[in-house]
Amino acid sequence: MSTEAPLNISEIFYSIQGESSFAGWPCAFVRLAGCGHGCRYCDTTYAEEPGTAMTIDEIMHRVLAFDAPCVEVTGGEPLLQSGTFGLLSALCDRHPVVLLETGGFLPVDRVDPRVHAIIDIKAPSSGVMEHNCAANFTLALNEPERFEFKIVVASEADYLWAKSYIAGHGILGKCSIIFGPVFGQLEPRLLAEWMLRDRLPVRMQLQLHKYIWNPDARGV
């Protein structure tokens, strides 16, 4: 039985993984409450609201009941809570595929090496690009199979910045990188055309869950 302090949980739900190299898989999600970064195109602002205190054992009971092929810990910003590291390790002990989605502002060096980390890189339109944690790039270059980076693009200016940024940090062509359009702001066709024009070796994604369900729905 876990003796760690409870974590503050926004929601636990079962849905389709929508925005990573694991997109399309049924997935159990644990969304932790709290963030505070203020990204302009955040689509989970409700995760800033007070959550429910749950122990790791309680979380595990809920998650394992879904019998999902993968589990994702997300937020908010999950790494703001110190108990997240213990939760990730506990999930890895019981589940073969554990994902972490983080905003990319905090180092991931304390994350259990069995976890596959999906790390955001914030572009200029986010309003918070100065908080990107460059230390994560060094870690990913040493163990590229454990990490992928995701950049949400709102304009061609964002796209050109992102292309230069990932090349400048040495991760282009060496780490898995995903570009996606800001839902409702950038036409996906434009992003696809820019990538094809530039022969850019990155993956394009759409937020799959927003095309399946109401884009503003929670728990999907």
Swiss-Prot record:
Signal peptide: none annotated. Its EC number is 4.3.99.3. Catalyzes the complex heterocyclic radical-mediated conversion of 6-carboxy-5,6,7,8-tetrahydropterin (CPH4) to 7-carboxy-7-deazaguanine (CDG), a step common to the biosynthetic pathways of all 7-deazapurine-containing compounds. Binds 1 [4Fe-4S] cluster. The cluster is coordinated with 3 cysteines and an exchangeable S-adenosyl-L-methionine. Binds 1 S-adenosyl-L-methionine per subunit. It is an enzyme of class 4 (lyase). Substrate binds at I16, Q17, G18, R31, T74. Keywords: 4Fe-4S, Iron, Iron-sulfur, Lyase, Magnesium, Metal-binding, Queuosine biosynthesis, S-adenosyl-L-methionine. Belongs to the radical SAM superfamily. 7-carboxy-7-deazaguanine synthase family. Pfam families: Radical_SAM (PF04055). One of its GO terms (molecular function) is carbon-nitrogen lyase activity. The keyword Flavoprotein does not apply. Homodimer. It comes from Chlorobaculum tepidum (strain ATCC 49652 / DSM 12025 / NBRC 103806 / TLS). Gene3D superfamilies: Aldolase class I. This is 7-carboxy-7-deazaguanine synthase. S-adenosyl-L-methionine binds at G76. Pathway: Purine metabolism; 7-cyano-7-deazaguanine biosynthesis. Its cofactor is [4Fe-4S] cluster; S-adenosyl-L-methionine; Mg(2+). Mg(2+) binds at T44. GO terms for biological process: queuosine biosynthetic process. It catalyses: 6-carboxy-5,6,7,8-tetrahydropterin + H(+) = 7-carboxy-7-deazaguanine + NH4(+). Residues 22-215 form the Radical SAM core domain.
